Each structure stands twice: as structure tokens, then as C-alpha cells.
């Protein structure tokens, strides 16, 4: 799987255009409300996504946040849209009305009623939902990103109609931390969203990458580390990033989904730098130094391709199984396109060297979901 990081300049326009033509489904606690916008235009690339009979074969159900988040949701949706358009398959997007299990279950049921043959869900909020519904809908194939079906307090159990894709976020974070220190930054910040496993892995890797570079360059690094308990833009996130920049932090790894916009706004005001997350976010703000990315688009398109090649059901290598993608599989990394490469001292040759080391597993990187990594030259500043 090659690096297929998304260029964000055209993403929002394409997505918003698709949503005009697709069925936009919103859910309420009392039932389902469908909103159809019938506006169409000539020569539309998303034309094949429109269903003549009101059914949609591929269903995407997002988690918390907006679809056009320039990251996690948007990257996955781009993969779905690209594959479906190329293969003339109908597809639709369903957003739960609120952040509750009931709303997410209602989204799954709506997608099923609308003819979904495969339902793609994102993130930990769907663990319990799919754990209960994988057996209720045995003929529907489920693709879970960044999560596995798991009932409360129990181990994950995957039915044969479920396939899960996880990522080694610690490796992406490692690359970002290493690059930031090699670039010359000595005062870093990590501002995570909710304290969940993928975010923890990003943070742990960021610390370890900064430590490795600091040891090589014999530098002392300070790193503020905190979670904000949200993936949405907020005044609180903006205020926290303002405090950090004013306190001397030079670059913040904004590992908090849509809330990264709040960090970028502050960085623009205070001449700070930001490290984006999940996808190439260089087009979102000129303050984005780089982005610790996951190849969500490539992972989704490859999974769909394999599914349809096998007649619309998961193959033996996928059915009831989980794969984890890292540098070895080229599933994580920093964007290398010219317009996204904003380093002055850290070169692409430096990047390729450290990336090869990860692929060959020359460095042992801890996931960091249990304990914080130990450091000598990176001095962590945690909230009291």
C-alpha cells in the first residue's frame, strides 16, 4: 500500500458537492428524518452515487465531528467516494443525530433499511454498537476503522462479516516528533482530544521520536502534554493553545480531530507552528509544519477492492480478522509532496532514512497505551 495522502485543497469542494447530490440522513431519538437535496448539475463526477431506487450499497457512518474535518472522517470518505465512483457503486453517508449509542444504532438500522451491503464505521464509539449488531445483520459486511467490536468490559469478538483495520499511530507520532526536533524546535506541545488508544499511541510516539532526535543531537527538549476531552473546535482548546504559545511553545501536535482548527487559528495569530493529524493538513493552514498521517484512504479502497473481488463478502484473510498497518506496510507517515514539506533543516533524505529504520523495525517504539515512555532529554510537563 503506497502513501496516498489526501490533498486537502480540493477535498472540501468535492465532498460538499457530493453531499448536495447524495442523500443526507439525520437521525433523531424519535425516529429517522431524511433530507434530500435534488439539485443536480451537468458533468458531475459523483453522478454514479445517486440511487434510482433509493438504495445505497456502501454506507459510511461517521463518529464525532464533521465530515469535512480535513482528517479522519474526510480521508475515509474520500476513499469510499473514489472507489464507488470508479466502480459505479451507490454509496451514502449517515451521521448519528448525537453522540449516543442509541443514535449510532439507529444510523446502522437506517443504512440497512436503505439497502447497505457494507457498512463502514469509524472509531471507538462503534465498538459496542457493532458488537451487538454484527449478528443481527449477518448478511451485511462491516468494516471498522480504528476499532474492534467489543461489548462493555469484554474482549473483542469479531463475527465473520466483520473486518477491522487499525494503525500504528505511535510510528506516525514518532516521525513527527523526530522531525520537529531535527528541525530545531526545543519547546513542543502535544494537545490530544479524548484519551483513547489511537490518540495515546500518537502521543507516545511523539515523545519517543523527540527523545531519539534529542539524544542524537544532544539537545534538551521540553514537551507539554495534555488531553482536552473533545474532538470538536472549542474556545477551551483555543485558550489552552494560546497559553502554550505565549509560554514559549514553538510547535503543537494538535491530535484532536476537528479541534485542531482551534489550534491552527491560535497559531496564525501568535506565529506558532502546528503538526496536523490523520491526513495531510497543510492546505488547512500555513502554520502546519507537517502532519502525522494514516493512509486511511488507501486502506479503505484496498479493503473495498478485496471485498468486491471476493463476491461482496470478506475473504478468509479478512473475515473476522483485524489488520494493523504501520510503516512496514506504508500505512503511516508524513506527507512528502513539495507543497506539504515545510521543513527547512530536516530534509527528505533525513526522513527516508528514519522511515527505513521503522520499516526494518530497527527502533522499538512503545504504543504508550499503558504507561508514558521514559525519557532522558525530553522533559515532560503534565497537567497537575
What is each PLM-predicted segment?
Residues 3-18:
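Bacterial N-terminal signal peptides that target proteins for export
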Residues 26-29:
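C-terminal motif of bacterial Sec signal peptides marking the signal peptidase cleavage site
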Residues 33-384:
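A residue-level marker of the well-folded mature domains of exported/periplasmic proteins
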Amino acid at each position: 500500500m503506497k502513501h496516498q495522502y489526501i490533498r486537502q485543497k480540493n477535498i472540501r469542494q468535492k465532498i460538499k458537492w457530493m453531499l448536495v447530490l447524495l442523500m443526507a440522513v439525520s437521525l433523531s431519538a424519535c425516529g429517522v428524518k431524511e433530507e434530500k437535496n435534488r439539485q443536480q448539475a451537468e458533468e458531475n463526477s459523483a453522478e454514479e452515487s445517486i440511487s434510482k431506487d433509493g438504495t445505497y450499497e456502501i454506507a459510511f457512518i461517521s463518529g464525532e465531528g464533521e465530515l469535512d474535518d480535513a482528517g479522519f472522517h474526510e480521508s475515509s470518505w474520500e476513499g469510499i467516494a473514489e472507489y464507488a465512483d470508479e466502480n459505479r457503486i451507490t454509496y451514502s453517508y449517515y451521521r448519528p443525530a448525537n453522540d449516543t449509542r442509541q443514535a449510532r444504532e439507529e444510523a446502522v438500522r437506517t443504512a440497512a433499511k436503505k439497502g447497505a451491503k457494507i457498512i463502514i464505521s469509524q472509531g471507538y464509539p462503534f465498538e459496542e454498537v457493532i458488537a451487538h449488531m454484527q449478528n443481527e445483520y449477518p448478511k451485511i459486511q462491516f468494516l471498522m476503522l480504528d476499532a474492534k467490536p467489543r461489548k462493555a468490559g469484554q474482549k473483542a469478538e469479531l463475527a465473520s462479516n466483520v473486518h477491522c483495520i487499525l494503525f500504528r499511530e505511535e510510528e506516525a507520532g514518532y516521525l513527527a516528533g523526530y522531525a520537529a526536533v531535527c528541525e530545531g524546535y526545543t519547546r513542543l506541545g502535544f494537545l490530544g482530544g479524548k484519551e483513547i488508544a489511537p490518540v495515546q499511541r500518537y502521543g507516545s510516539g511523539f515523545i519517543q521520536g523527540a527523545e531519539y532526535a534529542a539524544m542524537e543531537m544532544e539537545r534538551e527538549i521540553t514537551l507539554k502534554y495534555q488531553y482536552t476531552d473533545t474532538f470538536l473546535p472549542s474556545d477551551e482548546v483555543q485558550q489552552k493553545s494560546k497559553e502554550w504559545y505565549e509560554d514559549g511553545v514553538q510547535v503543537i501536535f494538535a491530535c484532536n480531530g476537528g479541534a485542531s482548527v482551534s489550534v491552527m487559528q491560535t497559531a496564525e495569530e501568535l506565529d506558532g507552528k502546528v503538526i496536523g493529524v490523520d491526513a495531510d493538513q497543510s492546505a488547512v493552514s500555513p502554520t502546519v509544519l507537517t502532519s502525522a498521517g494514516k493512509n486511511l484512504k488507501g486502506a479503505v479502497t484496498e479493503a473495498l477492492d478485496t471485498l468486491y473481488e471476493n463476491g461482496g463478502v470478506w475473504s478468509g484473510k479478512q473475515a473476522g480478522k483485524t489488520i494493523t498497518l504501520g510503516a512496514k506496510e506504508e500505512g503511516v507517515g508524513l506527507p512528502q509532496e513539495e507543497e506539504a514539506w515545510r521543513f527547512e533543516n530536516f530534509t527528505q533524505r533525513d526522513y527516508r532514512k528514519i522511515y527505513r529504520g521503522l520499516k526494518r523495525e530497527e527502533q522499538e517504539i512503545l504504543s504508550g497505551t499503558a504507561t508514558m515512555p521514559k525519557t532522558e532529554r525530553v522533559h515532560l510537563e503534565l497537567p497537575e
